[in-house]
């Protein structure tokens, strides 16, 4: 369905996640609105409701390279993340349930850093995630308000993107598992470090950790979440 207004254009998409699909109970009715504003923002609004108790944490896995083809990787991009904590992983790449400080770790992007040196100079730390970031940050928005989660800047094009969300988690992924087998615009292959993802979400594996914000959804509730990519 098309969305049209004075300063907004977009599209509304609906999907019914049927009872038992992938093992999850309940019919989960999901609506996602994608809106482009006159302020150069892409606004993504999620809503969902269910007819039986289930789990729900929706996100977006868009890849961003702000160079517009000038660079095949994001290693020269500069990134800042507005979080002081993260959820560490075990050797099997699963959350441990801990919430640790990013201070004195390679995940500390509280001040802008160039991604290339930040990743390549910390190979041992990022070995578990195939040589790059694939980590979840814990954002300071316990009251559900929109906060600035991250910023990305490309020095070649001068483009800047800010990420805002009302969700408690931000998964940052630097395309460590891309291997060139997928091609994009103009037939160019997507190789390792081709782009970066900012996946706003609930904390990973929250169903197994009671101290994480709940991802349970009940029939009398409406799930809602908002993410903004501002340019």
Residue locations for each model-derived region?
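An exposed, glycine/acidic-rich loop-and-rim segment of catalytic or binding clefts
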Residues: 1-231
């Amino acid at each position: 369905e098309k969305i049209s207004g004075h300063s907004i254009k977009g599209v509304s998409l609906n999907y019914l996640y049927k009872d038992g699909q992938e093992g999850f109970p309940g019919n989960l009715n999901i609506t996602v609105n994608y809106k482009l504003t006159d302020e150069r923002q892409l606004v993504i609004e999620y809503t969902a409701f269910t007819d039986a108790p289930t789990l729900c944490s929706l996100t977006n896995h868009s890849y961003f390279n702000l160079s517009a083809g000038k660079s095949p990787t994001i290693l020269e991009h500069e990134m800042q993340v507005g979080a002081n904590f993260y959820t560490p992983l075990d050797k099997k790449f699963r959350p441990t349930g801990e919430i640790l400080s990013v201070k004195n770790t390679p995940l500390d992007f509280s001040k802008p850093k160039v991604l290339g040196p930040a990743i390549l100079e910390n190979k041992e730390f990022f070995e578990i995630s195939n040589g790059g970031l694939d980590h979840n940050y814990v954002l300071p928005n316990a009251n559900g308000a929109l906060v600035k989660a991250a910023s990305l800047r490309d020095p070649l094009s001068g483009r800047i993107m800010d990420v805002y969300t009302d969700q408690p988690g931000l998964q940052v992924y630097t395309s460590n598992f891309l291997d060139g087998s997928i091609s994009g615009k103009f037939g160019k292959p997507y190789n390792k470090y081709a782009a970066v993802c900012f996946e706003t979400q609930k904390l990973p594996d929250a169903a197994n950790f009671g101290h994480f914000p709940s991802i349970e959804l009940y029939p009398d509730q409406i799930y809602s979440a908002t993410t903004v990519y501002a340019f």
